[in-house]
Amino acid sequence: MSEQVGQREAVDSPQATGVKTPPEPCPLCRETGPPQPPSITEEGKTNEDIDFIWVACNKCDEWYHSACLFLGDEKWRGTIPKEIISTVETNFGDEGAWTNWVEWIGKWYCAPCLARSTSPSNPRPPRHPLVATMKRASIQPKDIDQAGKPLKRSASTSAPLLKSNIKRPRTSTKGQETASPEIDMKSEREQQAESTAGTPASDAPQGRPKRKTAQIDYRNLNNSIATPTHQWLELIADPEKYGRTILDANYPALPGKLLTRAWLESQPLPGQPSSISPDLLPTRFWGPDREPLIVRPENGGFSSLGGHLPSKDLTVQDVANLVGPDRMVDVIDVSSQHSSQWTLQKWAEYIQSSSGNTSVRNPKVYNVISLEISGTELAKKVKPPKIVREIDWVDNFWRFNAGAGGKDVKEKGRGNDSREGSEIRKEGSHLTEGDNGGEIEEDLEGLKEKTNTPYPKVQLYCLMGMKGAWTDWHVDFAASSVYYTIHSGAKVFFFVKPTEQNLKAYAEWSGSYEKQQDTWLGDMVDEVRKVELHAGDTMIIPTGYIHAVYTPMDSIVFGGNFLHSYNVDTQLRLRQIEIDTKVPQRFRFPMFDRLCWYVAEKYCSDLRHLRAYRPRATTTPKPPHFRVLQCLSYLANFLVSQTGILEDPEAEDKARKLVHDRIPGDIVKDPEGLAKELKWRVERELGALGLLGEEASGVEAEEFKSNGTANGSVKIKGKEVSRKRDRLSKVFDKKAISRTWDFHPPAWSENRQSPQIETTTVQLPRPSTSSSDAISGSGPGASPGASANGGANENEQAELTTMLVKQTRKRMRELDDGTVIEESQETTFVEKKTIWGPKLDKEKISQPQGKVEEDMDIDH
């Protein structure tokens, strides 16, 4: 909704009837009426003679008097840019509120919309704060002169009558942008009067005109944030000139054949060398010192990774033909970082007209970074690296349409449900080397094409950028890892390592619109490193890396995002950063929470069968890699916290419903039980390896020690430990009624009665007010007749108020053997208050307020 201004005319206009109609009030002046300028009494005018200017909120489309905003309280006056307020007050004084300063506004938002945009209860907050803007960077003298002129009206005294006084904003014609809506109003009315030859028109235009202004499109802001691009391009071209330092990354290139899941899991335990490549530890991908992995053509190129790309002569026009010429795509204007929708054919024609062999190159630089190509002819020519397909959560855990027998295609060939003699399926097992590995992979791809249910499509992207394109600092959604191969052209990456401090700095930077506009992120982190990629180069960006991208020449790139089980902690951390910085849902990893439940359900099933008794088994299944187990502990804690929201009666209903809707109920029947079962099963395996942290509880941590073997087998020594293990086995062999067995006792059901208050008049001796007497026993608890001086004291009339509060609570639970236990508690609270009136003798002077005594008694 673009900013709108205009002037309203009533049904019976002064020109038509000669009767002056009071102006319509806005939401701010409905009770008091429109404000009057100071000069109205001097000139003998009334409110009917004043030209009230209207302005509409770009968010809710509510109309307001500009004068009411200018004269309103701080909340409403604060919605106007400060420069406009100061200019109006300086040049127009007290009459400034009635001038046409609205002409200087670019965008404006009302106070309720501003408050809602920053409210924690808003389920879909804007990506950037709502801020009123101006048309120009500064207000020119001609703008000030124009604002002081009266609004132009039609010169005709026989203006056609309007059918009603309802305001209906009129959209400006395509390509038309008027500087003065009042002039536009006049010309339209005159043209209509000429066309009707003075006859009153039944369909006369109604309401205020609407000025067409540029709209900010917030799509793709996960990868691109609106910034003054030119200054960053100048900075990266010559960092020393601006006092900055950008280091060459010098990340060593790796052989493509090394990058497999087997290499990722080649380190048996922390601190031990890799069994595949002792010099290249897999922690380079998932450890705290992880860094981008680069494969150059001389190291085997993309094909050595098990991937496949289209032929080298692929052009943007070919991409349009293979994906679909009419396919809509978001095209980003690099100079403003605003995006618009183009067809791929229009994009291809623009690139063709801007190619280097043409005499005149288009000055506008555009960038396409969000073209997902799954299910297209182009997708058949692109195959992600093998390591991506092996560990990608979507490929390995998402439940696509069920195949024959109600099983997912990834479950084919496993035999009956007992799994006797079969190994536990790990990530990527559908791609295991063997006779049917390729067949299962083809089945999975075919299932993706045929499925009617949505799933996260983020693994196949085609990125096309023009020379000079810039994508500002970002972390890919949910800290997902990225594979990135240059088909043609070149790219320059700027990296910031995802350390704890750097992630905090990034969260601060990305959560502030002002910092994104004028702060180089490199000033807030420890260092920035640069990597240059050329045609044929491939790079895998690890989890959570903060990066920006520059395009030195026209380029076509293929890449994709993937989540995995080796950095779940960082993935969950970035999910929270996205929530804290109010990233809209459409810019986050699609269906992330649902995917987490699928992962948990599969791993929990695998761990359950890992310990199952198989009398005819010929092989011994191996537990997941220690790094996967460590990350599953983070996943389990996250899911436990999600189920905690579901069971929290004090949580907002909206939050509880959000968690509930993201749980795949067809697969996960007992979310709390699944989360907690996964937690203790993971802790048991970590305990067996001797890797259970102090923060994780579990009896297995104290009883099982690892012998350090690669497969994590366990050797137990000592009779005492053996006896404990035997006792535990009897417990775990017993079938529980529910997986939530004995996790938490049931909550108390409380019943609190209303207070019972009784007031009576009694005869009691007045107690002493001295502290020494109170200690010695004087007072209500002392013997009757004891006075302050130890002598007898007469009874006096007093008012005794007794309040009794009774509270009971009860809970009941049933054990596995059918035993029912009921517990109840009862508490009685008694408060007594005794009041003696003022004395009528000489002591009344020293104690004019009387005496109040309270006595509390709690009876359990």
Swiss-Prot record:
Domain (JmjC): residue spans on this chain: 416-579
Keyword Disulfide bond: no
InterPro entries assigned: JHD, JHDM1_Histone_Demethylase, JmjC_dom, Zinc_finger_PHD-type_CS, Znf_FYVE_PHD, Znf_PHD, Znf_RING/FYVE/PHD
Positions annotated as zinc finger (PHD-type): 23-116
Subcellular location: Nucleus
Compositional bias ranges of the Basic and acidic residues kind: 183-192, 408-433
Recorded domain comment: The JmjC domain mediates the demethylation activity.
Family as reported in the entry's similarity comment: Belongs to the JHDM1 histone demethylase family.
Protein name: JmjC domain-containing histone demethylation protein 1
UniProt organism field: Cryptococcus neoformans var. neoformans serotype D (strain JEC21 / ATCC MYA-565)
